[in-house]
Each structure stands twice: as C-alpha cells, then as structure tokens.
Regions:
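Metal-dependent polysaccharide deacetylase catalytic core of the NodB/CE4 family, i.e.
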Residues: 43-59, 78-81, 99-103, 111-219, ...
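Bacterial N-terminal signal peptides
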Residues: 20-33
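Acidic, His- and aromatic-enriched active-site or binding-groove loops in soluble protein domains
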Residues: 229-238
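N-terminal pre-catalytic segment of deacetylase/amide-hydrolase enzymes
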Residues: 36-103, 269-281, 352-368
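Short, compositionally biased P/S/T/A/G/V-rich stretches that sit at domain boundaries
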Residues: 254-289
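N-terminal secretory signal peptides that target proteins for export/translocation
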Residues: 1-17
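Beta-strand-enriched, solvent-exposed domains that form extended recognition/catalytic surfaces
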Residues: 276-368
Length: 368
C-alpha cells in the first residue's frame, strides 16, 4: 500500500460565508491561468460532487441542466475515463497507479432530481456514478428526496448507493462539555443507524462514507474507520493521486454560478494533487489560537517551482509561502474566529506549469 492510508430538509455543501466563498473562488482563478492548462497529463483523478439538478430553488447547490449536459458532453468528447468509485478506491488501496484523465461522478444527499434529471443524462453516456444518501431524508419521506422505490429501481440498473450518515449532522461540531467517549458514541450511533437502514433496504452494507457537509476532525475520521467503511470522502477541493489518504479523499464541488461554469469545470480537470504530510495545525480541533504557523512537509518538493508556493486560509486569504527544504509555511499572528477554516497549499508543477493544490480542514470548538 502506498502512503495514502433546507434548512433541515436541504443540507448545504460548504459552510462558508458568502464573502469567504467568493474569496476562495477568486483565489483559485488567480492561481489557474490559461498557461497552466498545458503539459502532459499526470495520473491524477478528479472526483466531482453534485447536489441538485435543474432546481433553481437552491441556487448555491444547484447545477443547471444545460450546464450539466455540457459538462458530460465535454468528458465524452475529450476522452475522459469515467469509472466507478469502487474502482478508484481499489486502485488507492492496492497502490495501483492511476490512469490519466480519470473521473468519478458522485452526488450527495439523494434529491429527487437525480432520478428525474441527472440519471437520464448519465445513462445516455453510460457514465457510472455514486449517490451518497442522507438516510433520514428518505426514511421520513422528506419532500424533494428520492423514495426508496426510486433508489431500488436505480440500484437494480447498476447505480451505486453509499452512506452520507443517518441524520446529516455536522459531526465535527463537538458539543461543549461533552466528554470524548460520549462524543464518539454519538457519532458511532448515527453512522450505525444509517448503515443498518441502507443494508436492510438495499441488501448490501455501504462501503464508503461521504462526511456530512464535508466537515471533519480526527475523531470523525477515526470513528468512520472503526465503523468499517473502506474510504471516506470530504468536500475539500483537489485531485486524487497515488498519495491520497483513503479517509481524506477530496471531491470537487460543481454548483452555483461560477463553480458550475464550463470554464471552471475544465480548470478543475487540469489541476493536480500536491502531496504533503505533517500539517500544522493538523485537523484535530484547534489547540492553539492564533496558530503560530500554517504549513506542511512536502513529499516531492522537487516537482514544483520554488517561487510558486502559496497558502490560503479561508479567514485570512492567500499569502506567498516560504519554502525551506521540504517544508512550506507562513507565519501567523492572527486569531481564527470561524468555526471552520479550510487551508490550501498550492504551487506550479515545474515541468507542466499546471496548478497543484491540496486542502485540509481546521475546526475551532471555541468559535461562537
């Protein structure tokens, strides 16, 4: 094995304020000029995550159907290999090199427009896809969600269904005053309930877990492993490489206006992973505030242009980073006030000029 080891009825992806959301969009577009799209493809994969299809009631998590058709046509015309999620996970688990231009399509929550809008398009192209189900939404018959009859029809036709938890709680929100043993028990019970219902309904125990809202900490990931899942998926943007951790697999959200455009879709496909380890701060609940430093140890520092490294923190924006040996970092004196921050390290690949990046998440239990 390689190094990888609405409202209530409408769970939303990405818990950013509008300002930080737009700041992140701007940072990405600044980092990916047209020249970065050149070069031979490396064996990285892209996992897309969708939510609503053709449902303008939910503009922040919706993709228009004209946009979706255009995106699927782009994959077909440009010879991208759209593979089942299980095939990608098997490659990571076995240390098998990834094939260039590999794509996986995932859809979170289980809204009814998957059945009425997305499935006919995906079936037209013969593209496999995985739906991560918010189990309580189906069990209680919430409006806009798939019915179990629809799920069973799709499953019989080969659609893959996996677990997105029972309650869709923000599992990384460690309740104040709750002891760790109680916190773990709460997470464990929710995961077990959702998985048991899926197994009873579909006859198969779910193998993969998409973390609700993409929000995690070390306890959430630990309990996902203990629950018997083979892999866990975040909503951190980024590509998948041979060095991707099995319980921190990133996915690229396609939603809203800018992030559902074909331009953004193409840019996402051209990005590559930037493998690193020993992040500071790591993704355990924040222990020091302000964090004295943001950074990580690069696994392959020689791959990248030494003057191209930058670090983005949701609350602080993008800064030019310092590279010392295999360490890349920025020093910091500013306290973090948000409950969730995402940290990104980015650079330009030396040979191709393409943008390489990777994210991780910080949780701040003391935030209001």
């Amino acid at each position: 094995m390689s190094r990888k080891s609405q409202n209530r009825l409408a769970p939303r992806a990405w818990s950013f304020s509008r300002g930080s959301f737009l700041a992140l969009v701007l940072a990405w577009f600044l980092l990916v000029p047209g020249s970065a799209l050149a070069g031979e493809p490396r064996g990285d994969a892209t996992i897309f995550i969708y939510h609503h299809f053709g449902d303008e009631r939910y503009p922040t998590t919706n993709v228009g159907m004209d946009q979706f058709r255009e995106q699927m046509a782009y994959l077909a015309v440009h010879d991208y290999q759209v593979i089942p999620l299980a095939e990608l996970v098997a490659s990571l688990h076995d240390g098998k090199p990834l094939v260039p231009k590999t794509v996986v399509i995932t859809i979170d929550d289980g809204y009814r427009t998957i059945f009425s809008e997305a499935w006919p398009v995906l079936r037209k192209y013969g593209f496999p896809f995985t739906v991560f189900l918010y189990v309580e939404g189906l069990e209680r018959g919430y409006p806009n969600y798939l019915t179990w009859d629809q799920v069973e029809e799709m499953a019989a036709a080969g659609v893959d269904f996996q677990d997105h938890s029972y309650s869709h709680h923000r599992l990384a929100d460690w309740p104040p005053g709750m002891k760790e043993v109680e916190y773990r028990r709460w997470i464990r019970a929710d995961l077990a309930r959702g998985a048991a219902i899926m197994e009873r309904r579909l006859g198969v125990k779910p193998r993969f877990f998409a973390i609700p809202y993409g929000e995690y900490n070390d306890v959430v990931l630990s309990e996902a492993r203990k629950a018997g899942y083979e892999a866990a998926f975040t909503q951190d943007a980024g590509s998948v490489s041979d060095d991707t951790e099995l319980f921190l697999i990133p996915r690229e959200p396609i939603l809203g206006t800018d992030w559902a455009s074909l331009e953004h879709f193409r840019q996402v496909l051209e990005r590559i992973d930037l493998p690193f380890a020993d992040m500071t701060p790591d993704f355990a609940p924040l222990r020091e505030n302000p964090p004295a430093r943001f950074g990580a140890r690069l696994l392959y520092p020689e791959r990248y242009r030494s003057d191209s490294f930058g670090i983005f923190v949701s609350e602080l924006g993008w800064q030019q980073a310092i590279l010392e040996g295999d360490w890349v970092y920025i020093d910091n004196e500013t306290s973090l006030n948000r409950r969730i921050n995402r940290v990104m390290i980015s650079a330009r690949e030396r040979d191709s000029g393409r943008t390489a990046l990777r994210f991780w998440m910080l949780t701040n239990p003391s935030a209001p």
